[in-house]
Amino acid sequence: MVALFAALVYRVAAGNPGAGLVNAVRAKRAPAAPDMRFKVIWPHFETWPVKLRAAAEQGTLALSALRGYPVVLNFWASWCTPCEREAGLLAAAAKAKRGRVVFLGVDVHDFSGDARRFLGRHRVPFVAVGSGNSTSDRFGLVGLPETFYLDRHGRIRGMTRGQLSAAALRSQIEVAARG
């Protein structure tokens, strides 16, 4: 825990490379999401549109492959207590928006076995990917969970830092879907 706090303090003191992205989102400038390629760790397509499934079935997924749909991009870890508390909300929302909104979980700083156990325990019905430090940096993450809402053009329309509420998730999805 001390190491995580020290890393957070260092990141804040040194300047976060993704701070510009976060500032643009907060200013409602709808910046383009960084196009990154992720390793798929949880290939569950229950709530994904059929035509997107091929994008992740080969074991990697480019974020740009999801264009054409609003995306809820949730950064989490198995050891994160607020992530644990919001997992059921995300699973239920993904089922309710099945085929219309793409949910993608991004596991951060975790062991893949721990991540898969977390996903199975919460019966997550959408694809999850693993990430590295560059992902955290490029998105300007300062803690977990963090959720970004992309419109169908891959532009970030909103974000939530910390545990989601049902109302915040619902309203942010509506904003992304209109964008």
Model-flagged regions — what are they?
Residues 72-73, 103, 147:
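Hydrophobic beta-strand anchors of alpha/beta hydrolase catalytic cores
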Residues 117-124, 130-178:
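Thiol/disulfide oxidoreductase modules built on the thioredoxin-like
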Residues 84-122, 130-138, 171:
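Structural microenvironment flanking redox-active thiols in thiol-disulfide oxidoreductases
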Residues 1-53, 179:
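N-terminal targeting signals for export/organelle localization
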Residues 42, 57-58, 153:
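Residue-level recognition of short loop/turn positions
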Residues 67-69, 99, 124, 141:
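Active-site acidic short loop of glycosyltransferases
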Residues 61-62, 157:
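Generic structural signal for well-ordered beta-strand positions
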Residues 67, 75-92:
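Conserved redox-active cysteine motifs that mediate thiol-disulfide chemistry
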